[in-house]
Regions:
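Extreme N-terminal leader/targeting segments of oxidoreductases
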Residues: 1-19, 37-40
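Conserved beta-strand-loop-beta-strand element in the redox core of flavoprotein oxidoreductases
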Residues: 164-184, 191
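Conserved N-terminal glycine-rich FAD pyrophosphate-binding loop of Rossmann-like flavoproteins
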Residues: 49-76, 255-257
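Mobile, glycine/GP-rich and aromatic-enriched active-site lid/loop segments adjacent to catalytic centers
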Residues: 110-161, 237-386, 391, 477-591
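Core beta-strand elements of the Rossmann-like FAD/NAD(P) dinucleotide-binding domain
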Residues: 15-17, 180-190, 368
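Glycine-rich loop(s) and the adjacent beta-strand/alpha-helix scaffold that form part
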Residues: 193-252, 387-400
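N-terminal Rossmann-like FAD-binding beta1-loop-alpha1 element of flavoenzymes
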Residues: 19-45
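Long, amphipathic alpha-helical stalk/connector segments used for oligomerization, subunit docking
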Residues: 407-422, 426-512
Length: 591
């Protein structure tokens, strides 16, 4: 933790580059490597942690969940994803991903990733959509290849908070070091958002010290969504929340068991219930919730009786991804062959790699803001991306950035940006009804940073404010406490109370840079909460059980065979309904 200093002891570093990549996770690393290998453009990767162990792959994975085999085609994958999402997907985006997932898988293997093979040398698959790997080192492999690029600079431990723009073009971003008392102004001709989704909006399964034992990285706080929302970028399908079905307490993946040993979902009476409710992702969780509501819980994956060899495989598989599950089995003295594995749903997340919430982008991953691109979990419209889909989007965005810079479509050289460059700062979004803030200068962003060091002690600490936010979302916006159900009255209460917390967040006090980081993570989550609530109110149906369980409208409604999009404008989140995309229509063109 950095040494406590006075609010005036800050340095400002200004950086000029061709491409700024915000987020050094899966998509960000792959995009940086691609631009580095295939162009002369200078790239800066801004990462809040360290790219070697950051993002969703930090601890590793034991499978690549998007790999097409068994004679299936990319079109089959699109159909699978569309069916799972009840039709609310972008076919055009999904197809561009599905056409690349096998190619990027083979590229990962060339980089050194161990993909399991059978005696004939073929990949060991789980069904037709994924392959087994030894993936503990997958993120270090990606990071290593980024560092090999001579024209790529990685800045670790920097938190980006606000986009910078000139006129209608995004021209960089502002941020601060999470270790040293340093502020950053980064000027760029192109900016790629690759910050992942949003965790920590809702109260999690485990309390207290274990509250970060969750499915999605707790450090993915929705920063990429938030800075885009504040800047006026169009968002899509945020209401399509994701809830994961997980092993109880450890929050370890269940797919490894369900697909690896064919385990069925079982209630406390020994009845297999999954066929009763359906087997899409949300239906599996819906069935578990309904069985518990009916008094037939706890619920399990039926593993009792599997072979010792299969049990050993599960031990090893979880050591590659969620070692706490293996440790729990060992500590209890009973492995999965002796005892069924209890399951539960997590709190909801906003994540564009599993469901479809995120930036509204074209097929080349341009957002609606000129000069701004999106890839990975932060990009909307294309669920079921997983690791390889994020890599594919990183490459697609990288190719687009290179092509756009080659065309030099009106962008100035990075060293010639005007001094009167505008931004939207965190301070602009103080309540959902306020008037739209005007453009600000860099001093406004840095003033906001310094302001938190000058604040006196407030009623709530940052941690208490975060807990208040999670309690509000849990109880009024469809969290675990309400079995994921919500209604309009509750959403209105949530919106009002979250807006109050937004105001309070501006008064929070920081004693060091880590405190400042936590304050801005809270601010970003609050911004995402407000947008999420607006989307949930706008879809007046239950399109997806659990993911969007609207108690006022418990059935699907063909009227909502459309996308719910939004733009933050004139001080409020304005909802836009867009028709479903099958090709590349006029609705995709940038404003």
């Amino acid at each position: 933790m950095s040494e406590k200093k006075t609010p005036n002891d800050f340095t400002i570093e200004k950086i000029n580059t061709d491409v700024l990549i915000i987020g050094g996770g899966t998509a960000g690393c792959y995009a940086a490597e691609f631009i580095g290998e295939n162009s002369p453009y200078q790239v800066v990767v801004a990462e809040k942690a360290d790219i070697k162990r950051s993002g969703c792959l930090a601890a590793g994975v034991n499978a690549l969940n998007a790999y097409i085999s068994g004679g299936h085609t990319p079109q089959d994958y699109v159909e699978y994803a569309r069916k799972d999402a009840e039709g609310i997907v972008r076919d055009d985006l999904l197809l561009t991903i599905a056409e690349k997932v096998n190619v990027v898988t083979e590229d990962l293997e060339k980089k050194g990733l161990v993909i399991l093979k059978d005696k004939d040398g073929n990949y060991v698959t789980r069904g037709w959509r994924n392959v087994k790997i030894n993936g503990e080192n997958i993120k270090p492999l990606l990071a290593e290849n980024v560092y090999k690029q001579k024209n790529v600079r990685v800045i670790n431990h920097i938190n980006i908070t606000d986009l910078k723009y000139e006129g209608e073009k995004v021209t960089g971003a502002y941020g601060f070091s999470v270790r040293d008392q340093k502020f950053y102004e980064i000027n760029a001709k192109a900016v790629l958002i690759a910050t992942g989704g949003a965790a920590g909006l809702y109260r999690p399964n485990n309390p207290g010290f274990s509250r970060h034992k969750m499915w999605y990285p707790p450090f993915n706080t929705g920063a990429g969504y938030a800075m885009g929302i504040r800047a006026g970028a169009e968002m899509t399908t945020l209401e399509n929340r994701f809830v994961a079905l997980r092993c109880k307490d450890t929050i370890a993946p269940t797919g490894t068991i369900a697909q690896g040993v064919g385990a069925k979902q079982l209630n406390s009476k020994g009845e297999i219930y999954e066929t009763k409710y359906g087997i899409t992702t949300p239906e599996r969780i819906y069935g578990t919730v309904e069985e518990k509501r009916a008094g037939r819980g706890p619920c399990y994956l039926k593993t009792e009786g599997i072979s010792k060899e299969a049990e050993e495989d599960l031990y090893k598989a979880y050591l590659n991804m969620a070692p706490s599950q293996t440790l729990k089995w060992i500590e209890s003295g009973k492995g999965p062959s002796e005892e069924n594995v209890e399951i539960e749903g997590t709190e909801p997340y906003v994540v564009g790699g599993h469901t479809a919430g995120g930036y509204w982008v074209d097929t080349e991953r341009r957002t609606t803001l000129n000069g701004l691109y999106a890839a990975g979990d932060v990009a909307g419209g294309a669920p079921q991306k997983y690791v390889t889909g994020a890599l594919a989007e990183g490459e697609i965005a990288a190719k687009t950035i290179i092509a756009d810079l080659d065309k030099n479509t009106g962008s100035r050289p990075t060293g010639e940006l005007s001094e009167d460059t505008g931004i939207r700062s965190n301070g602009d979004l103080t309540e959902t009804e306020n008037s739209s803030a005007g453009k600000s200068t860099e001093s406004d962003v840095f003033f906001q940073y310094k302001k938190h060091f000058n604040e006196t002690e407030t009623l709530l600490s940052c941690e208490q404010a975060e807990e208040a936010m999670q309690k509000i979302m849990d109880e009024y916006a469809g969290g675990i406490a309400t079995d994921y159900r919500y209604n309009e009255t509750g959403l209105d209460i949530a919106s009002t109370r979250i807006a109050d917390l937004v105001k309070l967040s501006d008064t929070l006090k920081a004693d060091d840079m880590y405190d400042l980081l936590k304050i801005y993570e809270l601010k970003d989550r609050l911004t995402v909460c407000l947008a999420l609530i607006a989307h949930m109110k706008a879809r007046k149906e239950t399109r997806w059980h659990i993911f969007g369980e609207n108690a006022d409208h418990p059935n699907q409604d063909k009227k909502y065979d459309c996308y719910v999009n939004s733009v933050y404008k004139d001080g409020e989140i304005q909802v836009i309904y867009r028709p479903l995309v099958k090709d590349t229509p006029e609705s995709l063109k940038r404003r």
